[in-house]
Design a protein with these regions (language model features):
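Catalytic and substrate-binding regions of cell-wall glycan-acting enzymes that process beta-1,4-linked
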Residues: 335-401
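Export/targeting segments at the very N-terminus of extracytoplasmic proteins
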Residues: 54, 224-273, 306, 323
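Periplasmic-binding protein-like
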Residues: 93-95, 162-201, 230, 369-372, ...
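Extended ligand-binding regions for polar small-molecule ligands
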Residues: 58-74, 109-121, 181-222, 243, ...
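Extracytoplasmic small-molecule ligand-binding "clamshell" domains
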Residues: 58-153
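A ligand-binding cleft/hinge motif common to bilobed small-molecule-binding domains
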Residues: 150-165, 347-348, 352-357
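Substrate-binding/active-site groove segments that recognize
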Residues: 276-300, 307-318, 361-367, 390
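Short, functionally critical alpha-helical segments immediately adjacent to catalytic or ligand/cofactor-binding
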Residues: 258-274, 309-313, 335-340, 390
Length: 402
């Protein structure tokens, strides 16, 4: 039975020194099957792309595998080799507040973002498949239907099925519990000694990635609506105020190609759905438009709820177009951040990320920049809460409607 991967360093502690790469690769070359040679050569290439520890561990396992199959059967290819050959990482996932959220075209989540990051690190496409429960998802790994799983299954369940797990907190459970996330969230692999699992362990437990994981957890904070006051206040607004404006939200969401509940979440974050709201900075109405933005959107009366909702919807659509090069699902977070602090502020962050050699179209990178510079820029703090809160309100409404 495979043992769970708990910590990267602990996992390698018991390994003995394997044969040299040249010896291991010479075993591959001796096969007479041409098609199998090609597969094994691709495995060898994949080995060379791994960190030194992962490479030696992988070779150690291959050199000592007496039952290694030199036919074209499924056992002839490691999970890592299959992923690289397909250029796609297929993941079985169970919906949850710590794994992924997928309703009405919105697909995001703490585990989802980390899994997407791992796929990007491999240079492949992520193919996420939704399963009803942990056992079904783990069975998909067990029977080779998927490459790995994203669940909050217990270690006992994973061990009993002969699988290996990698905790996404990399042993730092307090990081997740602080933000209301389940510390059991993990990746599960069929074989802990496979290069796919070893590469994942190296990726998620890298010192820089551990810090990034904490920032992603901060964005997916689940504590907002677990607070009784916040939950009751939000529910009351949906019950008592929303019916007065629901048709306007729906009409203008259709007009400008939005999800209407996203507009409601924005309206609640902006004004608690108060049509007469006025802030000390001069923004007004349900969607809290500035005077200049209102004029640009054709709004003559900012406290008129219909005009305000239409103006907010129109402005959000313009912002989505402004960040058209940002792929979904990140584009909506970019647009919301721009709605809060202006598109030029977001583009300035993108420019800085480019200078740092980072992906400027990644929301995780933008959010990390906001978090890293929050102490020196109060607008960044406000923006972080703004986008994260809207995400929470949106998820709550979607879950209620399911």
């Amino acid at each position: 039975m495979a043992k769970p991967i708990t910590r990267f360093t602990r996992y390698f502690a018991h390994l003995t020194r394997p044969p040299t790469p040249s010896l291991a690769m010479s075993r591959f070359i001796k096969t007479k099957n041409i098609k199998t040679k090609k597969i094994l050569q691709m495995v060898a290439i994949a080995m060379l792309s791994l960190p030194a520890k992962s490479l030696t561990t992988f070779e150690h396992g291959m050199a000592n595998n007496a039952t290694f199959n030199t036919t074209l059967g499924s056992d002839a290819k490691t999970a890592h080799a299959k992923v690289m050959m397909r250029q796609a990482l297929t993941v079985a996932a169970v919906h949850g507040d710590s794994t992924f959220f997928s309703i009405d075209g919105f697909e995001h989540g703490f585990g989802y973002d980390l899994t997407r990051g791992y796929a990007n690190d491999l240079g492949v496409t992520l193919n996420l498949l939704s399963y009803d429960d942990e056992q079904d998802a783990l069975n998909a790994v067990r029977f080779g239907d998927v490459d790995m799983a994203l669940t909050v299954a217990s270690s006992r369940m994973i061990n009993d099925m002969g699988l290996s797990e990698l905790n996404l907190s990399c042993g730092r459970d307090a990081t997740l519990t602080r933000y209301g996330l389940n510390p059991k969230v993990s990746w599960t692999f069929k074989e802990g000694s496979d290069a796919l699992a070893l590469h994942a362990s190296h990726y998620i437990c890298d010192d820089v990635q551990v810090l990034d994981t904490a920032k992603i957890a901060h964005f997916y904070n689940q504590n907002l609506l677990k607070d009784d006051y916040n939950q009751q206040h939000f529910a009351k607004a949906l019950t008592e105020k929303l019916p007065n404006y629901k048709s306007s939200f729906q009409t203008h969401a259709d007009e400008y190609n939005h999800d209407w509940e996203l507009l409601v979440a924005m309206g609640y974050q902006e004004s608690h759905l108060n049509a007469n709201a006025i802030s000390p900075t001069g923004v007004e109405g349900i969607m809290m438009l500035t005077n200049s933005t209102a004029k640009q959107m054709g709004v003559s009366n900012r406290v008129d709820p219909v005009q305000s909702i239409r103006g907010g919807a129109k402005y959000l659509e313009l912002l989505k177009a402004e960040f058209a090069d940002v792929p979904a699902p990140d584009r909506i977070w970019f647009a919301l951040a721009a709605y809060n602090m202006g598109p030029y502020a977001v583009k300035d962050i993108q420019a800085k990320l480019i200078q740092e050699g980072k992906d400027a179209n990644s929301w995780s990178n933008v959010y990390a920049h906001l978090a890293d510079n929050a102490q020196s820029n109060g607008r960044y703090v406000q923006c972080m809460h703004y986008v994260s809160n809207i995400r929470s309100y949106l998820e709550e409404m979607k879950l209620q409607s399911v």
